[in-house]
Amino acid sequence: FFMQILYHFPKVVTNNFRKKYDVIPWRNNEEEFKKWCNGETGYPMVDAGMRELNKTGYMHNRVRMITAGFLCKHLLIDWRWGEAYFAEKLLDYELSANNGNWQWAAGTGCDAAPYFRVFNPESQLKKFDKDLKYIKKWIEDFDELTYPNPMVEHKFARERAISTYKKALN
């Protein structure tokens, strides 16, 4: 699917598929981006995913969606930053799939998740890794009681993302 999109709309390599999203005022905080890259967000599912990616060059699709959504919606960092990082790290990297999935996560793509869909990393953890097997595999010293606090509170980040998108699109 995304190969066809890329073939017919080559502009998606560097631009939003849906032009109306060009007005989103991304925060693009470099320190927050570094923490995301290093798996130091304070959200175990996001952190485990990024650590797995950095160590192996792989990440399960569900975790790719969670980490991508976190970067774009919780941190309001331009999807192109994350797309470039994944392109550099993924062993199974393929341009059209990487691009299309990042635009899906950011809400800017042809079949994107709506901008108001903001994954809760804690709910995703409970739903997909309730026994913490994945977390403990990639965060070796994981301890729920001493794990660092989230770099941004989910409720605040969700409301900020929805408000930012809504203001920009109206």
Give a label for each model feature.
Residues 1-170:
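C-terminal catalytic domain of photolyase/cryptochrome flavoproteins
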